[in-house]
Amino acid sequence: LKSKDLINWEHSTVNFPTRYTKEWKNVIRVWAPETIYDKKAGKYMVFYSLRTSDPGSFDKIYYQYANEDFTDLEGEPKWLFDAGNATIDGDIVYNENDQLYHLFYKQESGRGIFQAVAKNLTDRWRMLDGNVEQTKEAVEGVGVCKAIDGKSWIIMYDCYGSGHYQFCKSTDLKTFEFVQN
């Protein structure tokens, strides 16, 4: 979606099976798209979870760059990250303190929200140990943003079995403190 006034919106669609008729013809889902500005490439990266119906396939995070007027995607999907099993709901932020990109994601087999880091967006991502969420509930849909104080981060995720979001706070993106449901 694109808007000049946040009231009227223009909609663009990319149908993967009809647009990419060779390698991506068996796509069964593309979901949880997010964007981040790639300073190195000088354009917006759109990243999303994608799965095909091919044998042995599982959800992985792929990316493409948006065109200049943000109405289409350039090129074919490129692999960005997976944890070796279904990996969905990615969100990426850049932390100026450690000069790393932090990818937060749901790992289906690990049951929870995990994190990986990279120096550049398209580098190989290094998985970090431990869960991010501060609950035993099933979670998904992680979102991360800078707090209004400009010094800390807010991490939120959907506790989908209970019908609420939970919020945590972090000053270093390594340790996470429960704030509220």
Where are the language model's segments positioned?
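Beta-rich carbohydrate-recognition and catalytic domains
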Residues: L1-V30, I36-A138, A147-N181
